[in-house]
Amino acid sequence: MLLLTGATGSIGSRLLPRLLEDGREVRCLVREPRRLGERRVDVQIALGDLGEMSDPYLVRQALRGVDTVVHLAATIRDQPPRRIEELNGLATVRLLRAAERGGVKRFVFFSALDAHPAQRTRFFRAKWLAERAVASSPLQTSVFAPSIVYDRTDPWITLLRRFSFLPVLPVSGDGQAAFQPIWADDVARCVAAALRGELRPRYELAGPETLTYDQMSDLVSRIAGRPRPLVHLPLPLVRSGLIALRSVFGEAVFATWEEAELMEVPMLSRRGTADVQALGVEPRRMGDVLEEGT
């Protein structure tokens, strides 16, 4: 039995069908089973989310009979009263410790490229803390560290498309942070392939091209048929503006400062696409993927 968290996200929704095609029994830890769509009848359901990892009964039940955990679930914004640090860092440690006690053999954790303790963002620092715990576990563990992951309909791409209806395309900061964007489906194929064999301690997942945030923003607007000039907004203005908007609109706000700040952090792998290709996946270029969805 495999426990999958984050099954309704960009990566999880593409990984789940591949796990089932491989003949795996899957249990999904989800808050809203209906979001699994027609796949919900093919899996076992454990009701819960990252914020409930402190409930020992819930976690114990979710792990019952499980030999492999694939922990995809994460958040890049606070979910009051819980904060990014608890939802990404502490929740992972709680799940990991419960897996150790529950007889789980393999634990796969999704981190991010360039996560380390001196990073400017809370998200990356929380991911680094979780990585350290996973690496020191007695279980057979594996950390997948991708660059920025995208899909045709994910919130980030959708927001850029909406911005392209404006006369100009707003970009926070200088837009020069560099990424190696990788398609969610390519990531899912990598995980499925890795699970079929002996897991390596770490995989760095990067796409075939290096693009700045400016270049990605321009690419999305052009493919949407609405190329726009980019206007760079000073970070202090972005920060104060997004904090003010969140105080008014709460969780309905279109973006948070924490999310905007992530676009200032480069996510590059010195290995390039080597780890992806070693798993038998030829990663696709961002423009090719997005054009197929138009």
Question: Where in this protein do the model-derived segments appear?
Answer:
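N-terminal Rossmann NAD(P)H-binding glycine-rich loop of SDR-like oxidoreductase domains
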Residues: 2-22
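SDR active-site strand-loop-helix element
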Residues: 5, 29, 69-73, 107-113, ...
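Conserved glycine-rich Rossmann-like NAD(P)H-binding loop of the short-chain dehydrogenase/reductase
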Residues: 24-31
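NAD(P)H-binding glycine-rich loop region in Rossmannoid oxidoreductase-like domains
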Residues: 34-94, 98-101, 113-117
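Short alpha-helix in the Rossmann-fold core of NAD(P)-dependent oxidoreductases
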Residues: 85-89, 108, 127
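Substrate-positioning beta->alpha
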Residues: 94, 155-156, 173-195, 201-204
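Conserved beta-loop-beta element that borders a ligand/cofactor-binding pocket
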Residues: 111, 132-155, 159-162
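Mid/C-terminal beta-alpha module of Rossmann-like enzyme folds, strongest
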Residues: 190, 194-256, 266-294
